């Protein structure tokens, strides 16, 4: 009897199951991505399942701002004057705001007569010719220059010294004096390895500086891969000025981002962007050293800041979708989906993701006190920075009841 070889089996399958064969070959082609046409672009891509609260559970209980008050009452200021102003700070004399830009500068607002002036840069390698690209600064055209120019993200003033501390995505933790200039590096390595993606910081009353390192594998220019993979190599770090040493406080975090000490500094809050949640880390008391999830969020959180009452404002890129949850829970689908030769914007749109800004106010226990939305995606006085756009948003606050 004649035996069927592999070639004969393949022909038989093509004859009897042509659609299945085409699907199988298509999946194989996509998995290989030979022409590097997908958003992954030939990179090593190993998506994993990560911890996100169920979509229905979060969205079913989340209070919505049906009046879209942020969108209707917020104002866009300094349009095309500031590029990717991530964090906003005022100094102890009330001057500012100060903000870090996508071109590597920290700038300060000097009033209408003068406008914005360069206050500091994070490296002596910075030059206007190499780094300043105007409105293109917040596009991928700037990414290849960020390692040279720097990308200052988190800013905090020391209330007593007036020094400005900077978390730069490429140059780590730095400090610059009240008069500005070139910042001095404080922490670029921890345990002998580079800090790859410093993101935000806060200063404890004892002088220690807590800051987030978003990933040990990807820098800021490749931050989308942190989200797409669901990898959790991020860390919470602490720099101690007296000893000039940096320590790992927490590790295994999924895109740790914004950070804020509580009013009494017994704990700090930080956001985990990938896992869509607000997390508490206890610094004092019977729970010292413990970690708690205080709020599951409807979208991807960025910065967190405190108000005078000890409540917390959290900026969120909203909102999650059911399709996105399917990808989150099924890494193998993600592995195929993001290897499709389709632009990322279209892949996101297919998942129903149309991002807009939500600003939410929480108490110390994670209870939602207020939600402000910009459902039109345009965007206090709340001052609202944005890492991806070329403006600052402000909102008269508090809003009156009829607003």
From Swiss-Prot:
Signal sequence, renumbered to the chain: 1-42
Main location, first listed in the record: other
Top-level division of the source organism's lineage: Eukaryota
Glycosylated residues, chain numbering: 66, 206
Keyword GTP-binding in annotation: no
Knockout or disruption consequences: Abnormal stigma binding and male sterility. Abnormal pollen exine which is thinner, weaker, and missing some connections between their roof-like tectum structures. Content modification of a broad range of metabolic compounds, such as nonacosane and naringenin chalcone.
Effect upon mutating residue 89 to K: In lap3-1; abnormal pollen exine
GO biological process: pollen development; pollen exine formation
Keyword Glycoprotein: yes
GO cellular-component term (any): vacuole
Subcellular location: Vacuole
Keywords: Developmental protein, Glycoprotein, Signal, Vacuole
UniProt record similarity statement: Belongs to the strictosidine synthase family.
Function field: Required for the exine formation during pollen development.
Identification of the protein by name: Protein STRICTOSIDINE SYNTHASE-LIKE 13
Organism this protein belongs to: Arabidopsis thaliana (Mouse-ear cress)
